[in-house]
Amino acid sequence: MKKLLVACCVVSGMMSASVLASPSSDLQGRLNKVNSFHASFTQTVSTADGTPVQQGEGELWVKRPNLFNWHMISPDESVLVSDGKTLWFYNPFVEQVTATWLNRATGNTPFMLITRNDASDWAQYNVTQQGNTFDLVPKSAKNNLKKFTISVMPDGTINGFSAVEQDGQRSVYTLKRQQNGAVDAAKFRFTPPPGVTLDDQRQQ
């Protein structure tokens, strides 16, 4: 009888812990297991009816919470770098660089959500979980996202993520060859190339 009582208490405790572990906290916990990584990715953009309109590929480097380098290689090259204070966006085709303060950057974009992994950002979404897949629906109708989905393994490896905008356009990113570990600090530094136009919005 005593053993049965102990067993029941253990099972009850396990069930309580399961209930307390919300999808949102589970997602944050998984992402927190990997603080820095490098991966390549593919991108597919499609219209609301599923018609593909763009495919691309690139690489990204992340060091949470505020350092990242997102390098879109094709179809058109672009670079988005955060050095922890400034967010740099470089478009080689138009030879222009835009600089803004990172703390002014919106937290309602998929990449910012993943790299910052800030509880205040996740709190703006209703989060549901199905295995290793997490669906996030904004609580505010003013959000430019309609739905955000991310697949994260228990060890923190990100398989991919997708975003559906209010007009139904869907962007799907599949991550490949994620390598966890230290990232060269140079990846998070950016100096505008000579001759490009600098739109410095930090002065506004």
Curated annotation (Swiss-Prot):
CDD domains: LolA. GO terms for biological process: lipoprotein localization to outer membrane; lipoprotein transport. Gene3D superfamilies: Lipoprotein localisation LolA/LolB/LppX (2.50.20.10). InterPro entries: LolA/LolB/LppX, OM_lipoprot_carrier_LolA-like, OM_lipoprot_carrier_LolA_Pbac. It comes from the Bacteria. The keyword Signal applies. Pfam families: LolA. One of its GO terms (cellular component) is outer membrane-bounded periplasmic space. The keyword Chaperone applies. Residues 1-21 form the signal peptide. Keywords: Chaperone, Periplasm, Protein transport, Signal, Transport. It is found in: Periplasm. Participates in the translocation of lipoproteins from the inner membrane to the outer membrane. Only forms a complex with a lipoprotein if the residue after the N-terminal Cys is not an aspartate (The Asp acts as a targeting signal to indicate that the lipoprotein should stay in the inner membrane). Belongs to the LolA family. Monomer. This is Outer-membrane lipoprotein carrier protein. The lineage of its organism: Bacteria, Pseudomonadati, Pseudomonadota, Gammaproteobacteria, Enterobacterales. The gene is lolA.
